[in-house]
């Protein structure tokens, strides 16, 4: 399908920012995103049935869920130093090249630190994720989380974000398929009950 093709064309850039993953997931379910959905419908990017979505949190006919998955742990998030990102050609360059790969192959190791700065640390990212997860649960959104071959530290972060301990799956290898089947089954049961 077109979606699978688009996803297949993505490539890993660098680092893990689970907090940003969650932030985007929540934004896409928030009613304030509705004007964007409307514009996408007007441009023919989404079907007309999506024009009035995301619906209000008060809508009792809708179950809002997020499935958050990682195979890593939050790490320090770095940004390219402004002096290397201040022209159109430089922005095009960085859209095509991952910073870590570029530095590894083109910049001597003792000079690399001058090319970037730390936006926030892994601990700050975990704190931001915790805040996002709490606010999301307060809105009644159900959070499922999957930690694929993660460390104990990452498992703890993912577990605390999930709506409950039973909404967290720590999996290895092919167990991931069973986790997704279980989540889908439970979501369908919730829909039938409500």
Question: Model-derived features: where do they sit?
Answer:
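P/S/T/G-enriched low-complexity
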Residues: 1-194
């Amino acid at each position: 399908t077109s979606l699978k093709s688009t996803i297949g064309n993505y490539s890993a850039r660098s680092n893990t920012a689970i907090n940003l993953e969650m932030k985007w997931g929540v934004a896409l379910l928030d009613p304030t995103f509705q004007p964007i959905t409307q514009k996408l419908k007007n441009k023919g990017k989404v079907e007309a049935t999506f024009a009035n979505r995301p619906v209000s949190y008060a809508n009792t006919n809708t179950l809002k869920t997020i499935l958050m998955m990682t195979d890593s742990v939050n790490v320090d998030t770095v940004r390219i130093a402004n002096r290397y990102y201040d022209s159109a050609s430089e922005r095009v360059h960085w859209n095509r090249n991952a910073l870590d790969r570029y530095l590894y192959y083109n910049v001597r190791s003792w000079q690399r630190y001058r090319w970037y700065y730390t936006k926030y640390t892994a601990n700050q990212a975990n704190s931001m994720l915790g805040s996002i997860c709490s606010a999301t649960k307060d809105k009644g959104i159900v959070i499922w989380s999957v930690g694929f071959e993660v460390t104990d530290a990452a498992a703890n972060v993912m577990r605390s974000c999930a709506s409950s301990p039973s909404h967290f799956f720590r999996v290895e290898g092919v167990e991931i398929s069973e986790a997704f089947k279980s989540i889908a089954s439970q979501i369908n049961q919730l829909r039938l009950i409500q």
